[in-house]
Amino acid sequence: MPLPDFRFIRLLPLAALVLTACSVTTPKGPGKSPDSPQWRQHQQDVRNLNQYQTRGAFAYISDQQKVYARFFWQQTGQDRYRLLLTNPLGSTELELNAQPGNVQLVDNKGQRYTSDDAEEMIGKLTGMPIPLNSLRQWILGLPGDATDYKLDDQYRLSEITYSQNGKNWKVVYGGYDTKTQPAMPANMELTDGGQRIKLKMDNWIVK
């Protein structure tokens, strides 16, 4: 089955705006101990969320390709989530729906793909090795399986270092949205060698 062509969503007119919106500023101030009760409480508050959704700007940059898009991420239950990517003109490029044991992806031509591994499928179909399984935790400001991380002066994640399957990801958080409780990440950047993934969250709805 031919793979979908994502070239046309690269370098569209709003791409420069997306990159500007995704710039990351490292939080200032001394870091806090990962053993602090405030950090444990923050993690518990985030894990207690049953449903959440966020939307914003997405950028993937490597030597091979550059992709800029809008994204919508929604989780409706344990291991049940939806990821939507649209180009800067508003057209849907990719829709991924995941539930336990079944993942479906629909491309811009309406072609449907199924798998039991969302991370592997999105990598093969788009050429973007997005660490989706870990990103589901990182986007919430949780370390997931990572044990090497730092906190900011408000007992929230500021940086993660994580190695898996030959990838060495570094995640830097540029700020948090304090209008939601608990506070949720406002922007973040993932890097692995020459690859960069930037996310800027416009807003969060949490339950």
From Swiss-Prot:
It comes from the Bacteria. Pfam families: LolB (PF03550). Residues 1-21 form the signal peptide. GO terms for cellular component: cell outer membrane. The keyword Chaperone applies. PROSITE patterns: PROKAR_LIPOPROTEIN. This is Outer-membrane lipoprotein LolB. Plays a critical role in the incorporation of lipoproteins in the outer membrane after they are released by the LolA protein. The gene is lolB. Belongs to the LolB family. It is a lipid-anchor. A lipid is attached at C22 (N-palmitoyl cysteine). Its main location: membrane. CDD domains: LolB. Keywords: Cell outer membrane, Chaperone, Lipoprotein, Membrane, Palmitate, Protein transport, Signal, Transport. It is found in: Cell outer membrane. InterPro entries: LolA/LolB/LppX, OM_lipoprot_LolB. GO terms for biological process: lipoprotein localization to outer membrane; protein transport. Monomer.
